[in-house]
């Protein structure tokens, strides 16, 4: 659930030689105040005489104590109790701390920080414990808990750095403790408000809490020196697709599948990109942004920006993690898109007005209706259209991709020969035999004509009938040879040149015969990679007699491209093939190859609603 992502509270606990103390918490509503008001309201109600008495086990802890209320605030815990719980022993410091009380889960990373050395006096360096605790719903997933622990760890390291640099933490904690002592007679809520006004650390914690509850993106400055950047993916990705719970593990799986032929699509304006990187990394990010184009691949952007492909991978991965960009295949005419099944296309969707404001005079429903069925961009454009019209269509497709209204379909290939090919071959053989017998009619062929291998029959597309010469019946082969010999005998051998031409043609026939024998041997070697059943199915395809076609088929088969795990764009990139060349091969061997279209599983998994 979305509510399980938001924190209930952020708590700052401090411990040194003087003891432990809860210095700050936010939200700072008085603990137990709401429970008292609710109890008084329940008592003031008129009791129903027919109400059933509560017979709950008295040994169980009442659920309202320490419960996370619907308002999303932590209530029912006293400051003294929380301070004693979170001021852990040194043995538990510098590691993950997790505690579950009723329906609240507390997550932190206690950090031991040595105090800055005093210049005067040989005093021994003292250590203090700082523990920034996040209160979460007990039902929060493991990935969410892991993210909050990482944030607590980073805050501890940042405060440790500032303490060693300028004594920042000692100054802030002393000011908080002094404010508590001065405001002992005041309500706790007023004391915490005054601390937030005086202490920059309290202001930073309050800002962190608000950012976690709204965008999930943090860019907080500590002591006006150190910038802390953090992203809560489960919250940040909901800004672009409401209801999508994206955890870091899913993003990592997607980014591990990143290839040079992929492209990048920014989801925000350029001005918002600097929020996700510290100032030291802004220069390299702008190098990539200057050459950004959704029409080119990451490899092309790497070359144009004069960056290595590894640096481009890291920058793109960072932008995807921070929900600033998404992975696509570069926009081109052959890309196939279809309406996303969970696209918010109801009549009152805010995207309708947003689309009309972006593209004046255009209707979102009218434009997106062209993608009701899987359609390529090339099918929606014609050569007669003006380039400006084609550019507007590309911009509209980009806009719909940014708002997750469209999804791209890729073509995958599965090698799957038919199981009844032998039966089909036998029926085809019987059909050919019946055709031969019907065509010859009541002619009585010799027994030798009805025998022969299937290969010899298939080599002759049409049966050659017997002919009558001089009232005697002869076989077609005999007649053919006799006619050939007669033709040679009739033609006068008037010159040596004619004899030489006959000899040359005979030598050419011999060379062709040798080439055909070599091709036949190579075909047999190529077919050895298949099983007997698959080999028989491939032999029935006419294209299997072509050495080049069969060689390419065997190569792609051995590389594992026909297991529904690689789409055509990936095959084209890694094997350096043209799309037309690959499509022709798939068409020639369509009897043993199944082709289907679906979205890329690695990219699609990021925005599956959970």
From Swiss-Prot:
Compartments, record wording: Cytoplasm; Lysosome
Residue spans crossing the bilayer: none
InterPro entries assigned to the protein according to its UniProt record, in alphabetical order: HTH_NPRL3 (IPR056603), Npr3 (IPR005365)
Domain of life where this protein originates: Eukaryota
Self-association and partners: Component of the GATOR complex consisting of mio, Nup44A/Seh1, Im11, Nplr3, Nplr2, Wdr24, Wdr59 and Sec13. Within the GATOR complex, probable component of the GATOR1 subcomplex which is likely composed of Iml1, Nplr2 and Nplr3. Interacts with Nprl2.
Family per record: Belongs to the NPR3 family.
This protein's name: GATOR complex protein NPRL3
Organism per entry: Drosophila melanogaster
UniProt gene name: Nprl3
């Amino acid at each position: 659930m979305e509510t399980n992502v938001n924190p209930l509270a952020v708590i700052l606990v401090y411990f040194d030689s003087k003891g432990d103390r809860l210095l700050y918490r936010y939200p700072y509503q008085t603990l137990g105040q709401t429970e008292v008001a609710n109890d008084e309201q329940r008592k003031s109600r008129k009791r129903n005489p027919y109400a059933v008495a509560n017979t709950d086990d008295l040994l169980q802890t009442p659920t309202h104590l320490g419960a996370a209320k619907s308002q999303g605030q932590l209530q029912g815990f006293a400051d003294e109790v929380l301070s004693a719980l979170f001021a852990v022993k040194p043995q538990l410091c510098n590691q993950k701390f997790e505690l579950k009380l009723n329906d609240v889960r507390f997550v932190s990373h206690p950090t031991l920080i040595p105090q800055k050395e005093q210049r005067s006096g040989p005093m021994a360096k003292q250590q203090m414990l700082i523990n920034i605790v996040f209160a979460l719903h007990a039902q929060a997933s493991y990935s969410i808990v892991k993210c909050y622990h990482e944030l607590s760890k980073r805050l501890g390291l940042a405060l440790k750095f500032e303490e060693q640099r300028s004594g920042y933490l000692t100054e802030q904690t002393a000011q908080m403790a002094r404010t508590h002592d001065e405001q002992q007679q005041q309500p706790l809520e007023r004391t915490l408000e005054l601390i937030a006004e005086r202490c920059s650390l309290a202001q930073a914690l309050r800002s962190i809490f608000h950012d976690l509850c709204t965008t999930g993106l943090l860019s907080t400055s500590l002591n006006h020196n150190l910038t802390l950047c953090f992203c809560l993916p489960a919250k940040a990705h909901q800004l672009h697709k409401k209801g999508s719970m994206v955890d870091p593990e899913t993003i990592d799986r997607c980014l591990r599948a990143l290839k040079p032929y992929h492209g990048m699509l920014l989801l925000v304006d350029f001005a918002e990109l600097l929020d996700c990187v510290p100032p030291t990394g802004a220069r390299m990010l702008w190098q990539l942004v200057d050459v950004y184009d959704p029409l080119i691949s990451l490899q092309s952007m790497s070359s144009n920006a004069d960056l290595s492909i590894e640096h481009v991978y890291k920058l793109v991965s960072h932008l995807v993690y921070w929900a600033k960009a998404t992975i696509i295949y570069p926009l081109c005419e052959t890309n196939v898109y279809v309406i996303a099944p969970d696209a918010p296309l109801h009549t009152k969707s805010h995207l309708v007005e947003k689309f009309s404001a972006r593209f004046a005079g255009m209707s979102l429903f009218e434009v997106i209706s062209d993608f009701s069925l899987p359609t390529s961009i090339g099918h929606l454009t014609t050569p007669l259209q003006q380039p400006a019209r084609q550019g507007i269509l590309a911009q509209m497709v980009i806009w719909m991709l940014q708002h997750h209204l469209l999804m791209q379909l890729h073509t995958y290939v599965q090698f799957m020969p038919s199981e009844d090919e032998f039966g089909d071959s036998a029926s085809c053989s019987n059909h050919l035999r019946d055709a031969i017998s019907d065509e010859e009619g009541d002619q009585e062929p010799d027994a030798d004509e009805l025998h022969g291998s299937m290969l010899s029959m298939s080599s002759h597309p049409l049966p050659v009938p017997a002919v009558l010469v001089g009232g005697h019946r002869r076989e077609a082969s005999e007649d053919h040879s006799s006619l050939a010999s007669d033709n040679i005998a009739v033609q006068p051998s008037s010159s040596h040149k004619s004899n030489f031409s006959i000899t040359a043609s005979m030598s050419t026939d011999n060379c062709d015969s040798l080439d055909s024998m070599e091709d036949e041997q190579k075909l047999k070697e190529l077919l050895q990679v298949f099983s007997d059943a698959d080999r028989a199915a491939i032999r029935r395809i006419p294209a299997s007699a072509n050495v080049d076609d069969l060689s390419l088929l065997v190569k792609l088969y051995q590389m594992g491209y026909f297991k529904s795990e690689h789409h055509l764009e990936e095959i084209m990139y890694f094997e350096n093939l043209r799309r037309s060349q690959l499509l022709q091969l798939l068409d020639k061997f369509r009897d043993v190859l199944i082709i289907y279209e679906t979205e890329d599983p690695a990219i699609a998994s990021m925005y599956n609603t959970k």
